[in-house]
Amino acid sequence: MAKGKYDKYFLKEPWGVIHSGTPPDAPVYIGIGQKAPVEGWDEPLTQVLRPIYRPFKMIPEGHRHSIAEILYFIGGDPMNFKEFGAEVEFVMGENEEAETHIITTTTWVYVPAGLLHCPLDFKRVDKPIMFGHIMFAPTFDSTIVGSKPF
């Protein structure tokens, strides 16, 4: 089949780079822009979607990004995303302004540029959930301000 004019806009098999905090038996997750921009796309984007099926601390240390990040925590039942069988602990802010938020429902979190955030700890997982992030940047690594948290 001949290449079409718009083929570059269809990214097939967008597998993500395995995060160092990932349990060894974790399923591969999907993601784009983790280590390199998507070839042929004009807008910068990094995105990850991964199943969470057991408790673990994904990101143990706080970090910042040079741009905003959107995190999402979604119930794993595709017929009822409101069914959220997990408890997630997520920290935003630093020092006396640090707040620990407990996520027990399908939730989106906007993290402004420069705001210290994490640890991210999946404390209880009774049923699988989906976790992901979106950033309008050419790569995830390009946005880290300071030392890498993982």
Which residues does each PLM region occupy?
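A short, N-terminal "cap"/entry segment at the start of jelly-roll beta-barrel domains
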Residues: 1-62
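Conserved hydrophobic/aromatic beta-strand scaffold that supports enzyme active sites
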Residues: 71, 108-110, 133
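Short acidic (Asp/Glu) patches
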Residues: 53-57, 92-97, 113-117
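Short, solvent-exposed aromatic-acidic interface loops
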Residues: 90-96, 110, 135-137
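Short basic alpha-helical hairpin corresponding to helix-turn-helix/winged-helix-like nucleic-acid-binding
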Residues: 54-58, 63-75, 86-88
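Double-stranded beta-helix
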Residues: 1-15, 120-150
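A short beta-strand-loop-beta hairpin characteristic of the jelly-roll/cupin
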Residues: 73-104, 142-145
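Conserved metal-binding segment of the jelly-roll/cupin
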Residues: 100-123
